[in-house]
Structure formats: structure tokens, C-alpha cells
A protein has these predicted regions:
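Bacterial Sec-dependent N-terminal signal peptides
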Residues: 1-25
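N-terminal low-complexity segments enriched in Gly/Pro/Tyr/Ser
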Residues: 20-112
Length: 112
């Protein structure tokens, strides 16, 4: 029984799920390569600490915190991450997108 409980706790920790005052959310990378260059645990943490989505976006792109090393367009610069709020069926989603060029974006993670 203790082994099952410990395994469950490890799985919950690794999946970057966090509990926030009775609210639960999960940060899901678009693919495994993204999670190598984007600290999903830090993303979940600052999402929980942010006052609103604007504050969350500002914190994601703060040079001092170094949450992201994404350079998806290979221009030698770390890509700016924008935060989009959307609804899909009955789900409220927060989508994190890398800005690659003018009017060119790539989804990198979703917060469910």
C-alpha cells in the first residue's frame, strides 16, 4: 500500500500537476522536445503565483528567471512566449505560444 501511494505521489509530481487553493491544473507540453527547453515545473509554479494572465506572461519572459530556452525559429534569440486564454468545448484552457515571426506563432504548452 505504501509503495502504491509513493508511486502515485511521484507520478503526480513528475506530471507537473499542482494544487492551488482547491483549483487543480496541469501543464502539458506540445511535444517532448519542448519540455527540454521549457521548465514545466517553473511554469506551473509561476502560473499559480501570478495575479492574472498578463502577470503570468511577464513572469514567463523574465530574463532573471530563465524559465524558457526556446529558440524554435533558430534565430539565436530566445523566443518570446505569449499567453492566450481560450475555451474548447467545456474546458477553459491557457495556451502558451512562442512568437516566431510577425503573425507566426507555435503552441508550446497548454494549461488545463
Amino acid at each position: 500500500m505504501k509503495t502504491k501511494l509513493a508511486s502515485l505521489l511521484v507520478v503526480l509530481f513528475i506530471s507537473t500537476t499542482t494544487q492551488l487553493s482547491a483549483q487543480r491544473f496541469t501543464v502539458q507540453p506540445v511535444n517532448d522536445d519542448i519540455s527540454y527547453y521549457l521548465d514545466l515545473k517553473a511554469v506551473a509554479s509561476i502560473f499559480g503565483d501570478s495575479r492574472n494572465l498578463e502577470d503570468f506572461e511577464r513572469r514567463l519572459n523574465n530574463d532573471d528567471d530563465q524559465i524558457s530556452n526556446l529558440d524554435l525559429n533558430k534565430d539565436g534569440e530566445i523566443d518570446y512566449l505569449r499567453v492566450i486564454e481560450t475555451y474548447e468545448k467545456n474546458l477553459h484552457l491557457i495556451v502558451i505560444q512562442a512568437i516566431l515571426d510577425r503573425d507566426v506563432y507555435q503552441d508550446v504548452a497548454t494549461i488545463v
